[in-house]
C-alpha cells in the first residue's frame, strides 16, 4: 500500500466516524476522533494488534467502538479526553506564545516592509507616497491605535518628521535592504515612545488605550477567580478521593454507593485533570502579573527620565533622548503582549468548565462527608520515613540529602503508582517528605511507607502495571504524563514525510497503525587528541597543484645557467667626480656717513619782471 493510499484509508475511517456521530447529533473535531481511534487500538481489551494488517472486520469493529465511546456524553472519560484535546489545541506556553506573536507581527508587516525597502521612487509624488507608506508601517507596527483615525495619522506623521524628515528619504533609499529594515524598526520604536510620552503629558494620544490601568484592573480579578475555581476543584478532588478510599477499604457503611465506583474513579480523573490545568494556568497568570508590574515600573522610570531631560533644557541631544523613547516603545509592546497572553489564559480557563461532570455525580449525603485534604494526608504520614535498609533495590532520596529536591522530575505527575495499581485506579498524591525512590534513573513518590516498600520489591512489575492501567484508561496517559511510553505505535498520518516512504510496497490491507522508529538521547566522551599532532606546512591536498609543482621541478632540472659578454662590456667603468663643499664666508662693504654742516640756500632774485636778476647766497657760515 502506498503512502497516499494509507493516508486515504485513515481519512476515510475518521470521516466515517465523524459522519456517523453527526447523524446522531454530535459534531466532533478530527483531532478528538483521531485520539479516540488511537485509544481504542491501544486498549488491550479490544484485541487490536498493530503488528498485523487490519481486516475489513477489524476496521468496522474499530469504527463501532469509537462511535460508541464518542456518543456516550455522560461518560467522565469522554469529557476528560475532550478537556485534554481542548487544552492542547488552545493553550500555548508563555515563551511560545510570545514568539508566535512576534512572528504574526512580522508577517503582518512583511508586505509593507517589502514595499518600502524595494521602492525606487524618484519623483516628488513617489517620494510623498513612500513617506506615507512609512507612516502606515509605523502605525501598524506600534499597534497603538487604528490606522483609519485621522488624529493618529497626524500624530504619527508629526512625530516621524521630528526624527526622520522627508528630506532624508534620498539617503534612506541608498541604504542596503537590511539597513532599511533596521532603521524602520528603530524609527517605529522612537515614534511610539514620542506618542506615549505626549499622551503621558496630556498632549495628544486620545486614541491610545491605557494598558497599565486596564491590566491593573483586570489581573486581580482573574487571579482571584482562578484561585476560587481551583479551591472548588481541589475540594471536589478531596471528596472523590475520600469516597473512593472508603469504598476500597470495604467500609460497610459506604460500600453501597448509588454511583458505580468505576464512574466515581473516572470523575476523580476528570477533576484531577481540571486541577492540573488550572494550576498551570494560574501559574502563568501570576507570572504575567509579575511581568506587568516590572514593565510598569520600568515605564514610569523612563517617563520620569524623559520628563527631567526635556523640560529642564531648551535643546536636548538626540543621543540622550532617543534611547529612552525606544525603551518606552519596547516596554509598551511588552505590555501589549502580556495583555494578549492574559486574554488567551482567561479564555482557556473559562473553556475548561464545559467539560466538568464531577459535581453531578455526588449526592447531598456524599457532599457532607468529612474532607481530608492532600496536605492532611501528607502530614499524617510525614513521620513514617522510608528506611534505606528496606529498599536495597532502589536508591532513596531525602530532602536534606538531595540537592534541588523540590524540583525532582517525579513520575506519574507526583501520584502514587502503587495505590493506582493495588486500589483499582485510585489516585493518591505522593508524599515526598517520607522519601523518594530512584529506579532506573527515574524518581517515584508514594503515599505511604508501605507503598514504597512494595514498589522497591517489585518495581518493574508496578511500572508495567501502571502502563497497563493507562492503556485501559486513555485519560491517564496525559494526566500521569505517560506520553513517552505510548509512542511505540502511532497513526500513519503522524509519521514524518521521510518515514512514510518506508511503507512503500506494503501488502494490501488496511494497516492503520505503524511502529515508529525508537529514539533516545545518548552521549559519548572521546579523547580530543589521541595522537600527537604533526602539521606538515608543505602538505598539499590538491592534485592539480601537485602536478604544477612537479612540472616546475622537471623544467628546472633541464635548465643550465649561462653568461655572455658584449663588445661594449670593456667600456664599462665606474665614474667619480669631486666637488667643493660649501662653506660660510663674509666680506666688508662701505656704508654711508654724514656730518652736521649748514644747508646750502641759493636762489635767483628779480624773477618777477625786474630787470637784471642775480644769484643770492643765503647759506649760513660753517663756523657759526
UniProtKB/Swiss-Prot annotation:
GO CC annotation, single: motile cilium
| Record InterPro entries | FAP206
**Superkingdom, natural source:** Eukaryota
Q: What is its main location?
A: cytoplasm
Segment forming the signal sequence:
none
**Which Pfam family is one of those matched by this entry?**
FAP206
Q: Which keywords does this chain's UniProt record carry? A: Cell projection, Cilium, Cilium biogenesis/degradation, Cytoplasm, Cytoskeleton
The record's Gene Ontology biological-process terms are: axoneme assembly; cilium movement; regulation of cilium beat frequency; regulation of flagellated sperm motility; sperm axoneme assembly
Where does the record place it?
Cytoplasm, Cytoskeleton, Cilium axoneme; Cytoplasm, Cytoskeleton, Cilium basal body
Question: What is this protein's function?
Answer: Essential for sperm motility and is involved in the regulation of the beating frequency of motile cilia on the epithelial cells of the respiratory tract. Required for the establishment of radial spokes in sperm flagella.
The entry's family comment says: Belongs to the CFAP206 family.
What is the official name of this protein in its record? Cilia- and flagella-associated protein 206
